[in-house]
Amino acid sequence: MAYFLEQSDSEIFELIFEEFKRQNEHLEMIASENYTFASVMEAMGSILTNKYAEGYPNKRYYGGCEVVDKVESLAIERAKKLFNCQFANVQAHSGSQANNAVYHALLKPYDKILGMDLSCGGHLTHGAKVSLTGKHYQSFSYGVGLDGYIDYGETLKIAQSVKPQIIVCGFSAYPREIDFKKFREIADEVGALLLGDIAHVAGLVVASEHAHPFPHCHVVSSTTHKTLRGPRGGLILTNDEEIAAKIDKAIFPGTQGGPLMHAIAAKAVGFKENLKPEFKTYAKLVKSNMQVLAKVLKEKNHKLVSDGTSNHLLLMDFLNKPYSGKDADIALGNAGITVNKNTIPGETRSPFVTSGIRIGSAALSARGMGTKEFEIIGNKISDILNDINNVSLQLHVKEELKAMASQFPVYHQPIF
């Protein structure tokens, strides 16, 4: 495949190869990123990209769908088995599309959404004013207490005051486990539906390394990449037949047209990988590696939001530091460690600067790095932050980590 690309567009070929080198030589520690399975990439690059298939299996608007019907049906059945649920829609192009489809299916314009505050770890689609959800619906938020944990008592009070039609439990930057049972109790108290957004922790959920959203959530949304290591895409799950029918209509024709059949095939491939025993071993490694990293950083007197982590990510707190999340992001990037600046609870700086960084363990765990490597990485992160303007140190660390990274190739052959 790469041969044809090199011949037809050498510029793009070279840029992809450049990115291939970057991913191999740098330590990818952005919590939402991961290395997908090589088999998933093969499916993504297949001839299925040529086929339009508006509708659903055996209910298409186009002819010639007999093969892609089998592909999508397989993806649906594997998703249902993986998440132990009765209904699955695999057509959502992304996690944001999945969430918007849920709202479109279950809410009316200007209904009320209660989701986690963006600065406390929520996602744009959980009701942020700048997003579609914040414009088409009335959005309200809950947050975390001084300890960095979700304050369920305060969340109940907010829900009783707001009386939302839907409550969203999920996050993009919360280092602790979600208590779905408590959220369902809150939802029942105010007569709301409960949406569990497990985009970040889906891989941990299916490996029994995080609480399961069912039977507590009425509907569950997720991405298929991140901790699942599948292709970029979205997924919606439920055990309610009526909700499932509404979701299907909300995806097509409500918010999308033709599904991406190559992506759906890749999702099916990813789900099969997730069902293997080896994936449980991987998920355990993701958590144990993050525990080691948190331990090292705390021993080096670095402050962490909620004083640690229970999942695949942690947040470093720079509220009382002279440097910002942006400064740390740049310094660590210079040292070959890719993280992202992130707002944190009690944020005082702009979202473009921030007072924190988010660090994840999923991608490096996929490369086979273990607790030994994460201890080294933790010490290097500490060294960089303690002397944040020392460019020569950053370059020295970059070379050290590049040598370590070379022992853990992303892919064992140049697939790109």
UniProtKB/Swiss-Prot annotation:
Reactions that this protein is recorded to catalyse: (6R)-5,10-methylene-5,6,7,8-tetrahydrofolate + glycine + H2O = (6S)-5,6,7,8-tetrahydrofolate + L-serine
Question: Which GO MF terms does the UniProt record name?
Answer: glycine hydroxymethyltransferase activity; pyridoxal phosphate binding
Q: What class of enzyme is it?
A: transferase
Q: Which residues carry this modification: N6-(pyridoxal phosphate)lysine?
A: 226
Q: Which domain of life is it from?
A: Bacteria
- Which Gene Ontology terms describe the biological processes this protein takes part in? glycine biosynthetic process from serine; tetrahydrofolate interconversion
CDD domains per UniProt: SHMT
The protein's required cofactor(s) are namely: pyridoxal 5'-phosphate
Q: Which InterPro entries match?
A: PyrdxlP-dep_Trfase, PyrdxlP-dep_Trfase_major, PyrdxlP-dep_Trfase_small, Ser_HO-MeTrfase, Ser_HO-MeTrfase-like, Ser_HO-MeTrfase_PLP_BS, SHMT-like_dom
User: Where does the UniProt annotation locate this protein?
Assistant: Cytoplasm
The record's annotation in SUPFAM superfamilies points to:
PLP-dependent transferases
**Keyword match Ion transport:** no
What keywords appear on the UniProt entry?
Answer: Amino-acid biosynthesis, Cytoplasm, One-carbon metabolism, Pyridoxal phosphate, Transferase
Where is (6S)-5,6,7,8-tetrahydrofolate annotated to bind?
Answer: 118, 122-124, 242, 350-352
Give the GO cellular component terms, alphabetically.
cytosol
Q: In which pathway does it act?
A: One-carbon metabolism; tetrahydrofolate interconversion; Amino-acid biosynthesis; glycine biosynthesis; glycine from L-serine: step 1/1
The site (Plays an important role in substrate specificity) lies at 225
Q: Its Enzyme Commission number?
A: 2.1.2.1
Stated role: Catalyzes the reversible interconversion of serine and glycine with tetrahydrofolate (THF) serving as the one-carbon carrier. This reaction serves as the major source of one-carbon groups required for the biosynthesis of purines, thymidylate, methionine, and other important biomolecules. Also exhibits THF-independent aldolase activity toward beta-hydroxyamino acids, producing glycine and aldehydes, via a retro-aldol mechanism.
Q: Which HAMAP family match?
A: SHMT
The similarity annotation says: Belongs to the SHMT family.
Q: How does the annotation summarize its subunit structure? A: Homodimer.
Q: Which NCBIfam families match?
A: PRK00011.1
Q: What is this protein called?
A: Serine hydroxymethyltransferase
Where does this protein come from, organism-wise? Helicobacter acinonychis (strain Sheeba)
